[in-house]
């Protein structure tokens, strides 16, 4: 654990990975100063509420559903895309809620998920070596836009403001209405080739809604049935953006990163002695850490010591991302070592990043079956070790893209090019995401019955 006094800027004294170099240092400082003058995107009290919800997840009184785009885009920003994402998250949540008889904590990868880590600093584009694309908040995807520009942080902030405004409206309006969301699911079951597999759950939800209405419960007049809590999250990768959005809460005198309710550290930046861990140890938001197949028990426990030294329940989420072929070998030993130490940890699964492959044409994709297999293994391993599979973390979209192969739509390698729009990694489309939710619902129900 670092013995240095923490401040929003103390990370500058630590080694940093996956960070851009800006040529114009004066412009960088000007942009950061302007960002610091802007209102917070979220409030400290909301982040505390989320921590309380995540504490309930650890106590097996709720389940975490975290999902959204691989990377948000300036050019593809639209109200319809936000609506479609929110809609499919609500559809997934109602299925999981009913199957598990448990509240679902809904956290979007949205309103700030602009930066992406890259394996290499440069790449070849049109036979020319250029800087790698690191997300719209840093540089552009075209060859002429590869130089990092500080002013992109301002555009990311303003787009996040607009996104949050729309999400808050959806969460308090008709799009979160329980009856309306269930109608969306009925359409999915009706129009899906494998609909019969999910018909039983859909029928039982219909019966439950009918029973409530027969008892005089009017959904339109019952806030708990037409409004939802929806929280935001992103990877805290670009610390030049995160630092100026830190605020000291007037009620608790504690620091919060007000760019999102929840933040996470990626597999490439989780060095306990690195800048990203140093920055996040000092803010009181709930924190996630991606845990890959090579993580050791000692590394994970050191991260727990640095990021959650007081073992606060709901503070720390370990997001396992090992791949369907590796998780059965690596996760049991890791769980055994960490569970001995009695840490309050929310364990969730990211079944996307460990299952990325390239087709014969060099196109990045993920197989739905591999994603599903890793989720299944995650639940099975937790059961065997006497622990809880407490959440799922997905890269997904509400659109009808063709980026991941398989699922009930039987997307093939040959059909990927039909609607392949991602600027970074392949995402589950709306149908695949909802299909996965129905399948996870069965696992959650079984876990709850134990």
Where do the model's predicted regions map?
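Active-site-facing alpha/beta catalytic cores
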Residues: 71-72, 76-323, 366, 391-393, ...
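Glycine-rich, charged/polar anion/phosphate-binding loops
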Residues: 49-51, 273-276, 332-334
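N-terminal basic/disordered segments at the start of proteins
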Residues: 1-63
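Short loop/turn segments at strand-loop or loop-helix junctions that form parts
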Residues: 65-70, 107-110, 349-352, 395-397
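A general structural signal for short secondary-structure junctions and capping/turn motifs
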Residues: 54-57, 95-97, 279-280, 381-384
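Short coil-to-beta-strand
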Residues: 60-63, 345-349
């Amino acid at each position: 654990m670092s013995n240095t006094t923490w401040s929003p800027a103390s990370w500058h004294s630590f080694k940093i990975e996956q960070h851009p170099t800006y040529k114009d240092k004066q412009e960088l400082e000007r942009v950061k100063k302007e960002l610091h003058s802007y209102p917070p995107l979220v409030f400290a009290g909301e982040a505390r509420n989320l921590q309380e919800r995540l504490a309930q997840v650890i106590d097996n009184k709720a389940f975490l559903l975290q999902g959204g785009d691989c990377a948000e885009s300036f050019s593809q920003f639209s109200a319809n895309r936000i609506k479609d994402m929110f809609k499919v998250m609500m559809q997934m949540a109602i299925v999981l809620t009913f199957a598990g008889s448990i509240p679902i904590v809904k956290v979007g990868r949205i309103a700030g998920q602009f930066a992406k880590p890259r394996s290499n600093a440069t790449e070849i584009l049109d036979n020319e070596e250029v800087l790698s694309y690191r997300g719209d908040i840093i540089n552009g995807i075209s060859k002429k836009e590869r130089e990092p520009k500080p002013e992109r942080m301002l555009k990311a902030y303003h787009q996040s403001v607009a996104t949050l405004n729309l999400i808050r409206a959806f969460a308090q309006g008709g799009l979160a209405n329980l009856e309306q969301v269930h109608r969306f699911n009925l359409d999915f079951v009706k129009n899906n080739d494998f609909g019969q597999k999910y018909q039983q759950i859909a029928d039982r939800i219909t019966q439950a809604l009918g029973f409530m209405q027969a008892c005089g419960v009017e959904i339109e007049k019952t806030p708990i049935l037409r409004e939802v809590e929806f929280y935001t999250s992103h990877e805290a990768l670009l610390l030049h953006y995160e630092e100026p959005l830190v605020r000291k809460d007037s009620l608790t005198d504690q620091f919060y990163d007000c760019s999102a309710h929840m933040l996470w550290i990626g597999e490439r930046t989780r060095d306990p002695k690195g800048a990203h861990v140093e920055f996040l140890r000092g803010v009181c938001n709930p924190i996630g850490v991606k845990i890959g197949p090579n993580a050791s028990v000692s590394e994970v426990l050191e991260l727990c010591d640095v990021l959650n030294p007081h073992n606060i329940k709901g503070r720390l989420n370990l997001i396992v991302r090992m791949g369907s072929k590796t998780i059965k070998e690596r996760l049991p030993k890791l769980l055994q070592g960490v569970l001995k130490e009695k840490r309050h940890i929310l364990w969730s699964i990211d079944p996307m990043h460990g299952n990325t492959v390239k087709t014969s044409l060099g196109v990045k994709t993920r197989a739905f079956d591999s994603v599903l297999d890793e989720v299944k293994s995650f639940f099975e391993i937790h059961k065997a070790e006497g622990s809880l599979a407490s959440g799922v973390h997905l890269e997904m979209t509400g659109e009808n893209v063709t980026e991941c192969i398989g699922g009930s739509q039987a997307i093939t390698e040959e059909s990927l090019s039909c609607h392949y729009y991602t600027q970074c990694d392949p995402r589950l489309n709306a149908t695949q995401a909802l299909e996965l939710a129905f399948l996870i619902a069965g696992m959650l129900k079984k876990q709850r019955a134990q």
